[in-house]
């Protein structure tokens, strides 16, 4: 069934993204996320009711102005928040973009994925048909550690990664490295094993933890759960990249 003029709730727009997929990207940040990651740098996107309302056509008209900057590699990335919370809007937006030949990337943590819901899967599979690339943030491979880190289980997230791979959609995998929290070598080895089981992974990236979003927690009056966390050293990043076999996935 065709979406009936779905409305999207957009947190913000970035016209010249350079780290959100291949080439120069126009990045759309959608509102709403159910995860509560301890290192989240966009906590203002959590609330589903926030953001500015856009129609698919309005948003695409804004994005389309920047097409001359994308070249052959660039395009559109939709991030968040968690964009899969607005899947109807996202699907209509990507379908319009692909009809114009635009490369589309979905930047997601996968939390809304429902592997046991046939109706949801049908909608998800439709979205994947107009998705050129999925950028998946694998936060933690161990279920209990994932719950401690985000407040949610990760079984459905891992199932989503497998499903995307089975559909043949290209994947980039990202992992945020927080010393003392997400740098356990055994967990990183298990993550590498999982990534190796996926057939469509093109790139694996280690993202060093940073504190650039700390002021947002303070502005919102939320206690920051990692007051003593520090960014990883270059050697810690190198070791994580080695364990995750980053060199095998040049992208």
Predicted feature residues:
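Short glycine-enriched, charge-decorated loop/helix-capping segments at active-site entrances
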Residues: 44-48, 147-153, 221-229
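Short, conserved loop/turn and helix-capping segments at secondary-structure boundaries
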Residues: 53, 151-154, 231-234
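N-terminal [4Fe-4S]-dependent radical SAM core
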Residues: 1-30, 35-52, 65-72
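Conserved AdoMet/S-adenosylmethionine-binding subsite of the radical SAM
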Residues: 64-68, 72-75, 84-207, 212
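Short glycine-rich or small-residue beta-strand-to-loop segments that form or flank ligand, phosphate
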Residues: 77-79
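Short cysteine/histidine-rich metal-coordination sites, predominantly Zn2+-binding motifs
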Residues: 51-61
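Auxiliary Fe-S-binding modules of radical SAM enzymes
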Residues: 1-19, 172, 177-251
């Amino acid at each position: 069934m065709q979406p009936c003029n779905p409305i999207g709730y957009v947190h913000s727009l970035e016209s010249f993204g350079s780290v959100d997929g291949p080439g120069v990207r126009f990045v759309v940040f959608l509102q709403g996320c159910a995860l509560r990651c301890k290192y989240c740098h966009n906590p203002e996107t959590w609330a589903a009711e926030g953001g500015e309302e856009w129609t698919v056509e309005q948003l695409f008209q804004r994005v389309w102005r920047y097409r001359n900057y994308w070249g052959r590699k660039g395009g559109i990335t939709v991030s968040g928040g968690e964009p899969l919370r607005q899947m109807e809007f996202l699907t209509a937006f990507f379908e319009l973009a692909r009809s114009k030949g635009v490369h589309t990337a979905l930047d997601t943590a996968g939390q809304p994925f429902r592997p046991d819901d046939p109706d949801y899967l049908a909608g998800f599979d439709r979205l994947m048909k107009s998705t050129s690339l999925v950028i998946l943030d694998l936060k933690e491979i161990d279920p209990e550690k994932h719950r401690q880190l985000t407040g949610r289980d990760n079984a459905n997230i891992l199932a989503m990664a497998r499903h995307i791979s089975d559909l043949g959609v290209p994947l980039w995998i990202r992992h945020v490295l927080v010393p003392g929290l997400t740098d356990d070598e055994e967990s990183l080895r298990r993550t590498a094993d999982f990534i190796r089981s996926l057939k469509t992974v093109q790139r694996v990236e280690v993202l060093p933890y940073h504190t650039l979003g700390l002021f947002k927690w303070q502005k919102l009056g939320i206690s920051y759960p990692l007051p003593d966390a520090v960014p990883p050293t270059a050697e810690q990043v190198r070791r994580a990249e080695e364990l995750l076999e980053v060199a095998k996935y040049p992208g």
